[in-house]
Design a protein with these regions (language model features):
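Carbohydrate-interacting regions of secretory-pathway proteins
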Residues: 1-135
Length: 135
């Protein structure tokens, strides 16, 4: 988005057909090709889908319990919901709460909502039915 969002909910569907790292940036800024902020991870099984990663900052803030990885259906359409309210971020994959995390820096963050895909590596991620709602 070009607009900045404070409190919001985003619902979407994603499907991965090849290994690779992707995600949904929240309250993030763009400078050229550099995106700074927080990413809710979208990755193959065993790679922390639903966790929160801070780009150009502290790195991983929280990863989901490995047992929750069963919610992810690689090669199929998956539903993701992200709720951002104040300093709290809650992520869901196929109805399973992956993380529920509060962080002052996220709470103070300003920026848009962006989809991420790394270049190279043959990654294939598809997105559909993206709905963003202010809270």
């Amino acid at each position: 988005t070009t607009a900045q969002y404070d409190d919001f909910e985003v619902d979407l569907e994603f499907k991965q057909e090849a290994n690779g790292n992707s995600g949904v940036f929240i309250r993030s800024t763009v400078d050229g090709t550099k995106v700074s902020g927080w990413q809710v991870e979208v990755a193959p099984p065993g790679n922390d889908t639903g966790g929160i990663y801070e780009s150009y900052g502290r790195g991983w803030l929280i990863k989901p319990d490995p047992e929750k990885d069963k919610a992810l259906k690689f090669g199929e359409w998956n539903k993701m919901k992200i709720v951002v309210q104040g300093d709290r971020v809650i992520s869901y994959v196929n109805g399973v709460e992956m993380v529920n995390y509060a962080d002052e820096k996220i709470g103070a963050g300003k920026g848009g909502v962006l989809l991420q895909i790394h270049d190279g590596g043959g990654i294939k991620v598809y997105w559909r039915n993206i709905v963003l709602k202010k809270l």
